[in-house]
């Protein structure tokens, strides 16, 4: 009788604890990879590097981003935690409780967008795709085919559009 809960724990362990080597996570069923909190952290350094590369490219082109807007709290966390060495602009998100932080004093002139082009495009004159990010090791997680883009020409200030950017999906 006691073996059943233990067996259940062992089956679910790879979803919540880093017991599978990162290079082998791709061997799990894709549904398990997408549900795994552990799999969602795979690729954080690479995502931050990819966003920083687009930030630098836009700056070289005379369009330095004035803020970064993400579609989900995971991207916001990765950029906040690992992005300080890149001197990135303020990172904003309308996802879950990130929305409550508000835009602060961040400018909306040129917004580097991570996983939220569709969400921001109604509020800007121009939005375009710059790159598509995929996590390393063929892992299928929430960051698979993640779009990185840029939006310019805001139709209103952050404080005006902010109430419309909140989402809990």
Regions found by a protein language model. Give the residues of each.
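Extended hydrophobic/aromatic segments used for targeting, binding, or gating
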Residues: 84-124
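Short active-site oxyanion
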Residues: 64-68, 109-111
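Membrane-proximal, lumen/periplasm-facing interface regions of secretory-pathway glyco-
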Residues: 2-64, 74-77, 81-87, 94-96, ...
């Amino acid at each position: 009788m006691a073996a059943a809960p233990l067996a259940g724990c062992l089956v679910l362990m790879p979803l919540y604890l880093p017991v599978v080597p990162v290079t082998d996570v791709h061997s799990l069923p894709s549904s398990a990879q997408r549900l795994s909190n552990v799999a969602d952290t795979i690729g954080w350094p690479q995502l931050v590097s990819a966003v920083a590369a687009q930030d630098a490219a836009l700056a070289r082109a005379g369009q330095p981003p004035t803020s970064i807007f993400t579609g989900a709290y995971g991207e916001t966390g990765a950029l906040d935690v690992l992005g300080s060495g890149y001197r990135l602009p303020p990172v904003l998100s309308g996802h879950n409780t990130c929305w409550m932080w508000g835009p602060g004093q961040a400018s909306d002139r040129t917004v580097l967008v991570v996983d939220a082009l569709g969400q921001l495009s109604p509020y800007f004159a121009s939005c375009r795709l710059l790159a598509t990010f995929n996590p390393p090791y063929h892992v299928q997680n929430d960051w698979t085919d993640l779009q990185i883009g840029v939006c310019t020409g805001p139709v209103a200030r952050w404080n005006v559009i902010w109430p419309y950017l909140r989402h809990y999906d």
